[in-house]
């Protein structure tokens, strides 16, 4: 029988998959076995798998068909040391980013979903992409550069379309320019 922490993590992965399925009207599922089957020391497995198989074994969520660049990890924990994010030395967050980025390709949209007891849900995304928010924590990882931590509902309210766009295109520079141009005139963050 799985440990209570593993069950909690699996439950959160299913919750996120269901949320994404409902949000985008496309099938997202919890990855089978949910682990880095093609990450870390298992990179060589990519040589014998086709794109769909690789996508199925990246991260915790198998994305819908129109999200080929989507790479996600889900973490559900009792607590989180937010104060260490502010000091720039959060080993827990660094370990999660290591896990997320171990299976990442250069053009992937990498997103870390986090849930903490009595604190809520959050997303952590790379700041190299343009995101619409006025409420965030900024974190610089020594290994993985700059990230934003944003409250879950606020993030999805303002970035739902950007997630789909970034997950489907590899030319993020032109996406950023056109999406920012379209969003700024009508931006109302509150």
Annotate each PLM feature.
Residues 1-48:
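Acidic-basic catalytic patches of nuclease active cores, encompassing PD-(D/E)XK
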Residues 55, 76, 96-99, 106:
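Phosphate/NTP-binding elements of NTP-utilizing enzymes
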Residues 87-97, 101:
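Basic, flexible Lys/Arg- and Gly-enriched helix-loop patches that mediate nucleic-acid binding at interfaces
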């Amino acid at each position: 029988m799985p440990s209570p922490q593993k069950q909690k993590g699996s439950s959160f992965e299913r919750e996120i998959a269901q949320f994404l399925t409902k949000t985008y009207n496309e099938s997202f599922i919890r990855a089978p076995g949910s682990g880095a089957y093609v990450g870390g020391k298992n990179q060589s497995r990519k040589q014998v798998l086709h794109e769909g198989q690789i996508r199925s074994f990246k991260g915790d969520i198998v994305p819908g068909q129109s999200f080929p660049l989507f790479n996600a990890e889900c973490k559900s924990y009792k607590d989180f040391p937010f104060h260490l994010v502010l000091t720039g030395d959060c080993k827990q967050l660094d370990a999660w980013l290591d896990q997320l980025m171990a299976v990442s390709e250069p053009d992937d949209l990498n997103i870390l979903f986090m849930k903490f007891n009595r604190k809520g849900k959050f997303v952590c995304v790379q700041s190299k992409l343009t995101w619409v928010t006025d409420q965030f924590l900024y974190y610089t990882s020594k290994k993985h550069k700059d990230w934003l931590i944003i409250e879950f509902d606020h993030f999805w309210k303002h970035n739902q379309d950007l997630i789909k766009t970034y997950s489907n295109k590899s030319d993020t520079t032109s996406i950023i320019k056109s999406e920012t141009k379209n969003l700024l005139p009508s931006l109302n963050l509150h």
